[in-house]
């Protein structure tokens, strides 16, 4: 029996999203529960994968099944594809298993040609509608299938409106639209070299192929990387009978949410346009009306829609994002999905759904994307500064937050200015999916057109970016990179501030303050902490960082980088003296100047942590990073050392390395200069003793971490220095104190010999930044030059420095955990690379049995939630 690549909506259900994609599975589910859905079928994600395996061709087997299901649709609808008597028109939409709003391409009104449009015009008695559908189809097909840019057609529309003296597309007559369709086809022929296709089946296969192709377009690739959506998933294609919202004033189209996606409030929020097609709302071309006004225009359809909203939310137990069309007063549902929402809304909805009995606490914790918590910690406008400011304009508060920066008018400029370290606000007439990289680079987005459900608003909410849309008072001049608002002209580089909660726009920069964490945040985090087994620590070198991390729920310091403490002005001079010393005695004299500073730093950290664990990594970077580079500083050092400038320069030159990442650094420094390790040990132990004396009820157990071990004898050598020094300090103080000595596991050889290393270590901590560099054999600082090409070639899907490589690096980690614990059952194991704040990496750490992850302070909530989700999923999956 042939493999099944196509399913009628009536053959699927919501559990088949891996095969049918999210949109197809939900269309099937809505069909099954009796909602008014235009009939159609779904071409599976497997067909998309097969398309790529067959060299970007749709094979004969899949083509035959598509044609078979077109015939089934004809039977169901009583219409025929490409027929002149009763033509069937369809939409072709993408639908991956994970929602990707605005990332993929859609075609409406497929099946039209010059003859069919004349039949429709005559039979419907509505020629304007028929020609409007045809000109839209030509434009969409040209853009999506043949890659002729929309802009060429927009110019023709603008010229026609100017010629006819009208402002809106809906004011153009049937004759105007017929003329436009002719112009569009001429434009197509000029760009492509052939006539616009008139055969319905040829159109359909071109459209299906285009949707498959769009899975690999640049904006889809960017969105997938940002949202951890694997390339291998592919997209499904939904072919659906058209419902027309553009037949006249008793028709319309809209998008709605069962709850407010910006705040989470339990009230329907949405927008609709009369005499329009679906893409008009989400594309943000016209600014739509609030959904409540639909009650006046289409009272019966509105009443039915309110009931549908209730049915869908009760069915899916989550906030729904729905697309619908009203044709001649009759409601048709085109889509439902779990709606994108801001982080504050996600928390509010999750807490409310538990209170309403829709979700358990476990399910509520699983609802929230940990990465979105980041946005809760973003700055807000200072209340006093905001009160003193007067808005110069107002739009729709489409995605909350505060954004201020310099104005730019294109996504490319936003990226370029951001790369130069400038904060920018991207101002656009209307946002298109191609702007995604610019939206990522900008602090916030301001659009002239579009509503709360436009592409800009939906994607901004998903990214946690502040967005104000639909500020129609702006007179935009994109060509000259300026706009006028409230009588003032703003040029590229001028500063504005926007408030994504209120929709207000302000001249200049308004002071921002750190966000306050809401009660819902505390509730969700409380639930998360109940379920997780993985501890979450922080990477912190200063008391301020440590305090902030504790505020956000950190349970200790997993990495304190001591080298950062050497760079301060009052101690760098002494450290440079140490580097340029000739003997161990001279080095010790210089290090003794630094000792009280280091001790003071550690005491402050112990105070900030109040007895929680503090893991201190000994000096790691190569010495050349600490030496002076300017002539003046070199002369000052020579004077302090009483050495000629030439000798100091020779010492500095001697520190130069061809590959410093793999050079004289980490434990190699401690082997060469054991006095450095001895000084740092004294500082750690003395600080701990003083803290313990001040706070006898605190459990102060210093953790000393020796970096870059690749050979067990290195660890034994440096540990011997540490233990002798520490024991002598403890004995001299006359106290009893426990301490631990462990190592960073960041060299592949350390993973391979973890069994031996574990016998001599109290703990392991994976330094996954270096472990990734050394396993792949490329530098984190240089990888950016070629990773883009690797993404394009599908060699990598993600940056291995941001998302842990579980296949290679992960295999080494798993081996080190298993071999380490087999030889030292008490071994405590954590991770302190950047991966400690990445949700998928945190899940991997849970699954291989780590005790803790450590991440930067502001990523602590992300890791807490990710750890809880990992524990819940592991329990559910047995």
Language-model-detected regions and their locations in the chain:
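Extended, non-globular alpha-helical segments
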Residues: 394-434, 485-523
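Conserved alpha/beta-domain cores
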Residues: 93, 517, 527-878
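Short beta->alpha connector loops at strand-helix junctions that form conserved
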Residues: 41, 448-450, 469-472, 560, ...
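Nucleotide/phosphate-binding sheet-loop regions of phosphoryl- and nucleotidyl-transfer enzymes
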Residues: 1-389, 416, 422-425, 432-437, ...
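Structural motif
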Residues: 238, 408, 425-427, 446, ...
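Flexible inter-domain linker/hinge segments
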Residues: 208, 215, 377-409, 523-538, ...
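Glycine-rich phosphate/ribose-binding loops and adjacent secondary-structure elements
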Residues: 330-332, 425, 429-440, 444, ...
